[in-house]
């Protein structure tokens, strides 16, 4: 009876685990963006928090011969800040304008939901692979 290559289970787990790790990093950055969405600069006329964007990269795991996903660079979004006229705000410049972060919480929440779904998909792969491995072991034992 041929049970396939046991390394196939390891490969599946390796790819899914790399996806889990990448999505955790993505969710961390998105959470940071949301947490800072209403912050202002520490000094009058200064720049507030700037939205961060995560990139991913694909790397070859030479020991297994599979591509895994890695958290790439974390870049800053260069789009304009939101400017509100609030002369009484301590962060206001000489004209009474306050810069707010270039974070759109609706976009961040959408990205967060997407990251959660990707995380869940990778977790389902880990769970299914573990079950298949356990069934294979049970068949071999009997």
Language-model segment annotations:
Residues 1-142:
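Amphipathic alpha-helical polymerization modules
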């Amino acid at each position: 009876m041929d049970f396939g290559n046991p390394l196939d289970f390891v490969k599946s787990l390796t790819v899914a685990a790399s996806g889990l790790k990448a999505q955790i990093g993505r969710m961390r950055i998105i959470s940071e963006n949301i947490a800072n969405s209403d912050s202002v600069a520490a000094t009058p006329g200064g720049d507030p928090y700037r939205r961060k964007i995560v990139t991913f990269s694909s790397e070859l795991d030479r020991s297994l011969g599979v591509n895994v996903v890695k958290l790439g660079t974390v870049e800053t979004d260069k789009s304009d800040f939101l400017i509100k006229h609030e002369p009484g705000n301590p962060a206001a410049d000489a004209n009474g304008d306050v810069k707010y972060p270039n974070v759109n919480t609706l976009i961040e929440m959408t990205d967060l939901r997407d990251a959660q779904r990707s995380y869940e998909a990778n977790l389902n792969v880990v769970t299914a692979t573990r079950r298949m491995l356990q069934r294979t072991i049970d068949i071999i034992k009997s």
